[in-house]
Every structure is written in structure tokens, then in C-alpha cells.
Amino acid sequence: MAKEKIRVRYAPSPTGHLHIGNARTALFNYLFARHNKGTMVLRIEDSDQKRNVKGGSKSQMENLHWLGIDWDEGPDKGGDYGPYRQSERKDIYQKYIDQLLEEGKAYYSYKTEEELEEQREEQRAMGVAPHYTYEYEGMTADEIKQAQEEAKAKGLKPVVRIHIPEMETYSWDDIVKGHLEFESDTIGGDFVIQKRDGMPTYNFAVVVDDHLMKITHVLRGDDHVSNTPKQLVVYEALGWEPPKFGHMTLIINSETGKKLSKRDESVLQFIEQYRDLGYLPDAMFNFITLLGWSPKGENEIFTKREFIKQFDPARLSKSPAAFDQKKLEWINNQYIKKADRDTLLDLSLNNLQEAGLVDEHPTPEKMEWIRQLVNIYAVQMSYTKQIVDMAKIFFEDAKELSDEEIEEIKNDDGRAVIEEFKKQLDLIPRFTAVQIMGAIQATRKATGIKGRKLFMPVRIATTRSMVGPGIGEAMELLGKDRVVKHIDLTLKQMSDNNL
């Protein structure tokens, strides 16, 4: 027997930018498809016209490509099972709506929103979970037809609802969660499959699309568990075999332990925000893959090829995945250290230009200087936009030292080191990192001061910071004139404060 051809889909709604949670869904489907040499489908679920954002689908596709996620079929690539936008499939949905109506498995419902809300209020008052109750209960076929014609004559527009069989259990063996089942009386009554504007509801359209596109596995977020029994109702009514379902656990904020919500401003949640900060796509791919999936071994840095080779949905976590910002920064730093320097230069240059620190068209000499600047900070950056704050001393006039910096150098040793180092700088033939380090060693010999008491006063006086890249490289890029100016400012500030 031939092995089943794996077909998965990622089906976003174009309601805004690509969210971390949606990116994870896309990524896991991508890895599953590639691991099994299957097919990944991109489908745009834009049936809810009110929620769609102009350019939303384009933005999401661009960010998926940036992450390194590609697909085999979709609105931009075509395929044998299109169209791949729900808004272009209305006639297809109507065919199956008509089939269910003709078979008596669905019906027109003319209850207004006001009547439905009144019904829900009554149920709440009785302590009953709100649910739809069949509006034609006890009526004959002729009476139902007459009631519908009267409603139609009043200008009321109907929805189409699907009959939910009574006393039935809907169950599936979830790839992540194991066996799950729901009783039909917990679904909420006959639910809408076509809205008043003629567009299908999500739980109907997704079934038709998945079946016709021959989707074999559906990997999606935990929030879709409650949709699955409704979709199984539709599968059963249409006589179709459902795909295998897998529901990934929620992503939580590692600081608060709460579900990652778009209202939680303590965490950046959209891929575009990380792009703007200068995160690398391979690092984001790596980090997101580890949100709820565990590779073999202790290593946490993998190539895309390694992830594809290892990916097994059986290793998807049953516990919520914690979004740890510090871990993301660590992973991105690992990738920055190994990144192509031209890539880092482009990202950092863009960040510096956005901050107004570098002209739009720098000279070749300036570009080479910026390249060296990026190189000395690369090992420290968690993302490239950090260079704007890290390297401000290279672009702005020196400010007075902070109280913490003054505290570090206010003793006699501090002044002695700074004054001697200034003398030694005048003795070096060329202002290069190697020569500068030689001047520091000469200062050590002249003063007898070493270690932190030697290097910290030199760093603070010359770069106006207690931390930073290699001190020799930093001073070389600052240039001798600025370094000496910084030293003079430091000595003046110490004198002004009687230090």
C-alpha cells in the first residue's frame, strides 16, 4: 500500500501583521511537510470582510518568506486546488450549502440578532449555558415553509444552520493532546454555516477547503479545539473523512505565566517588530521552533535543515510554551556572531540612518569606518538596533560622566592612570589598536597599577562607558583627537569635583 502523501496548510486571516503564535503554526506545518516530503498549502481565510486589513495578506506572506518559510501552493503560486483565497470560493461553498439544504441537513433560520440575544439572556437567567434552540420545533414541513415565506416577505435575510444530531459523541485522536471527545449537546445547538451576506462561516468553509484541497493533517493552535467538534459535524453531514488534527499548546509570557495576549505590551509579538530591531531570520526561525517543540539532545542552536530532519509532531509539548525574551536575545546573539558581516553592516547601517546618526549616502571611507564599528560591536549585540545606543559616543559629543563612572575612578590610582595614559599616547607613532594597547601596558609599568584598576579608568576616560568592545579597537575608531578630548574632559570633571 502506497504511503499517504502528506498535505498540510497554513491558513491565516488577513487581519493584521504576522503574530508570533501564527508564525509558529506556519513553521510547524512547514517543518512537518518538509520532513515528510509532503506539500504545504497557503490559504488566505478572508471570508470575514469586516475584519480584513488592506495589505494584510501581502504583509503576512512577506514576513513568512523573511522567516524562511515557503509553500508549494497558494494565491501567489497557484496549484491544482485553487482558488486559494476564501473570498474567491463563494460559488464552491454555495454548492455544498445547497446540498445540505436539499438533503434536509441544514435549514434557513430567520431569527433576528435581537431575538437570539433575548433567548441567550433568558438562558443565562435560568443558569443554562447560552445555546441556539430550534425555532421550528413541533412544526410540520408546510408550517415551516409558511413561516419562512412570511419572514422573507418582511425583508428578513436568513442564515443557514446545520442540524446537530442528538445524543452523538464527536471524538478524535489528537496528535498532541491524545484522545478528545465532545457530546453533541455541548456544541451550542445548530450553528450557522452561512451568514446573512451569503458568505460561509469559518467552521463550514474550513471543512470544504480542507477536503477539496486534500489536506491530510491540520496542525493549529489550542484555541481551535472547541471548533473541531463543529467541523466534525460538517464532515459527517457531507460524508467526508476528516483529516488528522493536532492542537498545539498556548504560548505564555515567561514573566507573568499568562497567555500571550495581543494586549500584553511587555512582549513584542509581531514578526515585523523583530525585523525592525535587527533580529536575524534564521535566529527567529530557531527560537520559534523551540516554542513548544523539543529536539533531541541538549543543543538549542540548529540549522533549518537539522530542524527539518528532526521534526516529529510527537515531540510537541503538552504544556504551554513560555516566550522567554532573554532566550530569544541569546539565540539571536549566537547567530549575529556567526553572521555574514555584509548582512550585519546592512542592518546596522539602516538602524543608524533611522536614528539620524549616519547620512543616507555615506562616503566609501565612512562606510569602511561603519563596517569596523559593526565588527567590534557584533559580539555584544542581541539585535542590531542596539548599536544605536551602544555606539552613541562615536557620533555625539561626550557627556559628563555618570555618578557610577565617577565612583569607579575617583581615587588617586584612577587619576594617576588617566594622566599617565595620556602621556603614553603622545609617544606612540601610529594611533592603532595595537599601539594603543602598548600604551596601556606602558602605563601599567609606569604606575605599577594593573587589572581592573588600570583598565577601567582608561575605558571610562576614553569611551565614557564602563562596558564596551575591545578598548584598543574602540579608541582607534574614535580617533586620537576625540580620545584626548575625552581624557581632558574627564580630568577637568575630576578637578571640578575635587577628586
From Swiss-Prot:
Instruction: Offer one Pfam family short name for this entry.
Output: tRNA-synt_1c
* Molecular function (Gene Ontology), one example: tRNA binding
Quick one: which residues bind ATP?
262
Matching entries from HAMAP family are given as: Glu_tRNA_synth_type1
Q: Which PANTHER family does the record match to this protein?
A: GLUTAMATE--TRNA LIGASE (PTHR43311), GLUTAMATE--TRNA LIGASE, MITOCHONDRIAL-RELATED (PTHR43311:SF2)
Q: Subunit comment for this entry? A: Monomer.
Q: What is this protein called?
A: Glutamate--tRNA ligase
